[in-house]
Amino acid sequence: MAVRRIATFDDWVDLFRVWQKDIGVAYPEIVDYKFEAKFGPTRSNEIEFGAFKGRPKWEKVIQIPDQRIRDAMQNLIVYQGDTEFASVEQQRRLFQNAPSEHDRQSLCRVVTEEMRHGWQMCHLLINHFGYSGRVEAQKMLERRAFDQKRLLGAFNQDVDHWLDFFTYTDFVDRDGKFQLTMLSYSGFAPVAQSMIPMLREESFHLGTGQDGIKRIVRAGVVPLTIIQKFINKWVPVSYDLFGVDRSSSAHWFYVWGLKGRYDEPQAKEEADLERMNEHSRFLFHLECEKLIEQINKHIPAGQTPLYVPDLKFHRYIGEFAGQPYSVKGELLSPREYEEHLREALPQPEDIKLVTEIQATEPNWIAAKGSVQ
């Protein structure tokens, strides 16, 4: 990668093309995609919550009344953009072994739209945040998930195969839907307007994941116990992505009108500023339970249904970080917990088995359109 600092968005686009080639995703259908910034109408032209509620949304950074608020807004954009590019890097090796041409095209669309979302965030940084925005936009293309350099740990983990991919897009991308929704209420108009097209595109990613898991369950070749292990891998990671408990950052994001609650339009009560992240995480957990209920409809009678891991299981962030809770929420001894993790999470032999099944069993996943 070039080390010279970019001066314009066109400079950044040149680096973006180098990044595509460098990570190995410069396929024709991706390179030929028309990358562009997209904006949509927001629910309101006024700030909808926090200390500035009722005032016009800020159209330019200079209108934001405090440098701390400007810095916080930039930071939110940086973290969102970093996840978008990271997810492409995580999924870059899946093109060679897609189960069908339909799935390859779905993967192409998912990674292309993730790239566009990163492009959108960098467009905001470069066009609204001056020198610091340009620096951060360039750094997004210099970090690598496979070098463990992305800002959030979830986006430095490998996505090894298509079961990994489907569980990732169903749950980790669903956290993304929550984050984009909360930012769609932002008092900084360019961010709020950016989220509308991004959410439309993100819905395809979620559907790809949910449909993929259903198709794997319907085929009945991959053992349900292994499918459960990959749910256990990615759901707790998604819990952590909501951030620490009693977060002062989430508190001030709300007070400053930068990031609302997921259910902001429907919420009747005042926001609990001390538990903003916990509120979103709980709503995410409820949504995951409904998803698993839908998947379980495709499991034959008499077989053990899938389930959502408890909010306390395998956490690295928040009140339960590092504590020995089981997938069912039971407190274990440290020794019991170590053994439980070996049983509950994917092990090398599980990854090997899934890889072998996907390479040798042509019917390991049901055809597209075979499930509802």
What does each model-identified segment do?
Residues E84, Q91, M121, K177-L180:
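Non-transmembrane amphipathic alpha-helical segments
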Residues M1-Q105, N127-D160, F242-Q372:
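Terminal targeting/low-complexity segments that flank the catalytic cores of oxidoreductases
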